[in-house]
Amino acid sequence: MDELKKLAGVYAAGFVEDGMVVGLGTGSTAYFFVEEIGRRIKEEGLSVVGVTTSSQTTKQAEGLGIPLKSVDDIDSIDVTVDGADEVDPQLNGIKGGGGALLMEKIVATPTKKYIWVVDESKMVDQLGAFKLPVEVVQYGADRLYLDFESKGYKPSFRVTEQGDRFVTDMKNFIIDLDLGKINNPVALGDELKAMTGVVEHGLFNGMVNKVIVAGKDGVKIVEVKD
């Protein structure tokens, strides 16, 4: 599986050119993209500026010598490459399995070309088998949990290996919703954002331009149909 992820990540790095501002994604597939950017800077003299989507990616990028800027210090991002946990035929997706969904969405928003890199197991007919992460402020989180429960969304607080509640880079909690199937991702996204205490959700609807899918037969590109 790592070989497929590496294939997708390295392929995506081919979209990066000199002088670009590049969004650096988080997760096991985006990791290989960031590594390849680091290699190209070192071996080819590639000149780019990175904008990271998590403290984890910041640490990786700094270790590779990738120059970084805050999302607040740039006008726009030329290309962002990130992973996804599920992608449907309309290229809506679920992200946030690594807990970085808020920063990932903040970086995706000013991005001109937004690309996901996945292995073929992430392409699904309908979203929802993967639990949907919802980032919530700590204050009142238990009330939100009960609200989700009353809606039949089967919530669970994300926890660390030690059993403590997982805290995001932005110091929020994550409640994962076990929905099974999501019939209308856009309506659900709107509903969640309207709930007081919800900071962000892991539905990325209509945001991505292309998805690089690595499978046993190589790499294919799936693009949004006009």
From Swiss-Prot:
Pathway: Carbohydrate degradation; pentose phosphate pathway; D-ribose 5-phosphate from D-ribulose 5-phosphate (non-oxidative stage): step 1/1
Highest taxon of source: Bacteria
EC number of the protein: 5.3.1.6
Catalytic-site annotation from UniProt: E104 (proton acceptor)
Record GO terms (molecular function): ribose-5-phosphate isomerase activity
Keyword terms, alphabetized: Isomerase
Ranges that cross the membrane: none
Record-linked HAMAP family: Rib_5P_isom_A
Gene3D superfamilies reported for this sequence: 3.30.70.260, 3.40.50.1360
UniProt KW Acetylation keyword: no
The protein's role, per its UniProt record: Catalyzes the reversible conversion of ribose-5-phosphate to ribulose 5-phosphate.
Binding residues for substrate: T26, G27, S28, T29, D82, G83, A84, D85, K95, G96, G97, G98, K122
InterPro entries: NagB/RpiA_transferase-like (IPR037171), Ribose-5P_isomerase (IPR050262), Ribose5P_isomerase_typA_subgr (IPR020672), Ribose5P_isomerase_type_A (IPR004788)
Name of the protein this chain belongs to: Ribose-5-phosphate isomerase A
UniProt organism field: Streptococcus thermophilus (strain CNRZ 1066)
GO biological process: pentose-phosphate shunt, non-oxidative branch
Known partners and oligomeric status: Homodimer.
Group of enzyme by EC: isomerase
Source species taxonomy: Bacteria, Bacillati, Bacillota, Bacilli, Lactobacillales
Catalytic activity: aldehydo-D-ribose 5-phosphate = D-ribulose 5-phosphate
